[in-house]
Amino acid sequence: MLNNIVITDEERKLFLSWTALDEDLAEVEPDLAEAVLRSRLDFARGDLSRTDYWHDPEGIDVFEDVPYVDDGTRAHRLDLYLPHDSVVRGGKTTPVYIDIHGGGFVYSYKELNRNFCTNLAKLGFAVFSVNYRPAPETDFLGQLEDVAAAFRWIRIHRHEYPIDQNNVFLTGDSAGGTLALYMTAIERSGKFAKAMGVGQSGLTVAGSAFVSPLADLTPYLALCEPGTRKTIEESKETSIVEHIAPTFFAKLHAKKTELTNLATMAEEVEFPPILINTSSDDFIHVESLKLATALVAAGHDVELHDWYTHKGQSLGHVFPVCMSWLDESRETLRMIHDFAYARI
């Protein structure tokens, strides 16, 4: 219990199956720890109503909790979901998606995205789902370094699995979309990789599919300026990303690079084909539109799916990931499939 925040034993047992709670907050300053824990609990209680729908479709082989860094930590593990037919046939032809989960940079592990990943695998993909350290355990650049380490592990070990050795696509939702965007840029641009201080893995990214990505970091980098730190009372009116921004983005802000500007990023990086999915009632709807606009203005190949929600209807944020059983989600998964298969 932190500052009278109550977590029942039942909640703790269940929520820990897909997210950190307070076990990494003991050394964190109290107001930040409280904001993070409240956000994790709010997110987890929201996801709880969907757990009855979580299941693995038939015909998917699962390789769980493979360490990509041998340090024994949960945050440095990945899963691989493979169509059983690919295992039986034993070829090297199944194209690859690497999924990076979201959660406001503070919430969830790969388990939260399992339903999305297994349903994507069912359509004919090998899907790697990667963990990374949540904030405040590390910062934005630390999360990029974690994901890059997972990418390097995949490059080194991919020959051990019946998967395509060349066709690798990325996907990520919300904050995971941010990490997927930045990792796409890192893998496609030595200049961008150097600016971030994150080494390239050697994987060739053939395309990326972003679901409701948080694309524009410039408002959060501005919060790293002196005197902008919000108190816990003020932060109740803002997002968890705004609350963690002064520390979470501090090292990125210190780099003073123009490459975090979407227009500059789009002009400087040789992006592969990009798919972006959002909905009109996505609370960060504008982020997808800003990213698509910047990429199109720079001449990149962009496929934008902007679902319009009518009165009485709701799709919301990252709906294909958190509610993969919806008809709209199944159609989105099919579009993500078609996007990749058209480019292999």
Residue ranges and their predicted role:
Residues 1-344:
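Alpha/beta-hydrolase superfamily serine-hydrolase fold, recognizing
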